[in-house]
Every structure is written in C-alpha cells, then in structure tokens.
C-alpha cells in the first residue's frame, strides 16, 4: 500500500545520518511509500522489512539493500524526517517495544 504524501523536509541530523548510511532521497521516498507505519511515543516510525518490498523489486540490489531501514518522522506532520537508521536483525520489534508515552 503506497502513501500519497512524501517526506518534505529533512533535519540537519537526518541529512548527516543519510549520508553516513549511503541513503539517497529516492531511497527515503521508497521506504516512505512501502514501509510499515508505527506510532510510538513522540515519533512516527516507518520500517521497511523484506515482506514490504514488492515481489518484482526483491531481486534488485538497490531495493534489497533498503531492508531494515527505519525512518523517524515528526508525528504532527509526518513529513519532517528527524533521523534514519538500519536494523535488519530485530526489525520492527524494537519499535513496538518503545515507550507509549514520554517520561517527564
């Protein structure tokens, strides 16, 4: 299921992390369009697992390398990228286990 909108703005921290992880803006848009959405705590997470990659793209390295990519977005707009990381081994389990509310 593809989303209509896309990532509009990227923080300075996120652009640094994207460069470190060799992710382009096209990669970010692909993960945004095909990944699973998780609302947890004060962030919106989008996780791209192997099952989220369409069958016709699974054999292509440029899409397969995106497996395990997590985008962390501002929950208010859902269009401001805060950071990005990869977690191929534990996947979305870590995201689902994060605190549901913030601790003050």
What are these model-derived regions, one by one?
Residues 1-104:
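Ribonuclease/tRNase effector modules and their secretory precursors
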């Amino acid at each position: 299921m593809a989303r209509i909108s896309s990532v509009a703005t990227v923080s300075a921290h996120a652009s640094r992390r994207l460069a470190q992880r060799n992710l382009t803006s096209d990669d970010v848009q692909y993960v945004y369009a095909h990944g699973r959405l998780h609302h947890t705590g004060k962030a919106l997470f989008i996780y791209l697992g192997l099952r989220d990659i369409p069958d016709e793209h699974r054999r292509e390295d440029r899409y397969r390398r995106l497996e395990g990519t997590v985008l962390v977005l501002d929950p208010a707009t859902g269009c401001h990228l805060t950071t990005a990381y990869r977690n191929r081994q534990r996947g979305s389990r870590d995201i689902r286990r994060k605190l549901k509310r913030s601790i003050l």
